Amino acid sequence: MTPHDEQITALLTQLDQALGSPATTHGLARTLRAAVKEVELHRHHRASVADLSDGVLKPSPTKIQIGGGGHRIEGFLNIDIVPPADLLWDVREGIPLADDSTQEVFSEHFLEHIDYPRSAKHYAHEAHRVLAPGGQLITGVPDAAYVLSQYPAPPEQATEMIERWYAKRECRSDINTYLDLINYVFRDQDDDPTYNPHYWAYDHGKLVQLFCEAGFKTVEPWTFDPTMANPKRRWASVYVIATK
Ligand SMILES: C[S@@+](CC[C@H](N)C(=O)[O-])C[C@H]1O[C@@H](n2cnc3c(N)ncnc32)[C@H](O)[C@@H]1O
């Protein structure tokens, strides 16, 4: 174990002890839980870094999915920071592929979960770097433009949208009005540590700007393909396909 890994292990022990103390207040506990989660992600990532000689996957996969969670796609190498991915990797640190080495990068409902601008812009540049010329980046996110366009929504419509997105979440009982729904699209911050917050909201125009800035030649709307994308994401999401 390296000195850094020893430090991280000691830190985790300290965080657990502080969290277990009755003196720890609600605000401090929230921050400590977030820190524990980051430490655990960091450990997954460090273990994968140690397994990769030269820091890149060899041979390079033809297609990769980023942040697929439980939605694995056949024929793709599935990269996520938590299981059941093929590679546990923190994409905020880059994409571990060689330059110009892959044909397709797919993600949906992932981009809004990494901080903007640093990590979102880094991701766009990394996707551009690893794609071969002509390669394609497909990206789907919750469509903030759609959600905002419905405001102010009548209570029945608000209830329908809330049910579609949050029926299975523990937070469901706290999402009561349309403005609560808008808050969630922009800042999804469940106290449940298994959820990643939303850090930034996107629409078609923002995706075009982000990927053009990263060097992609064209960014067009992508026609939803349920053989690849998660069918539950079809509603109220916006997808684009960017070509290098
Ligand atoms: C809301 S889920 C979406 C899962 C799937 N794409 C879908 O549409 O059902 C977001 C996913 O992004 C992953 N994720 C978040 N931050 C990440 C990071 N820094 N590196 C890799 N994956 C990350 C999470 O672990 C999670 O699986």
Where are these predicted regions, by residue range?
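Membrane-proximal basic amphipathic "stem/tether" segments
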Residues: M1-K58
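A structural signal for well-ordered alpha-helical scaffolds and beta->alpha junctions
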Residues: H45-V49, K63, H204
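A short catalytic or substrate-binding loop motif that flags glycine-/basic-rich loops and adjacent residues
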Residues: L57-K58, G69, K232-W235
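Conserved SAM-binding loop
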Residues: P61-S149, G205, V240-K244
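S-adenosyl-L-methionine-dependent methyltransferase catalytic module, highlighting the catalytic core
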Residues: R118-H122, E126, A132, Q136-T243
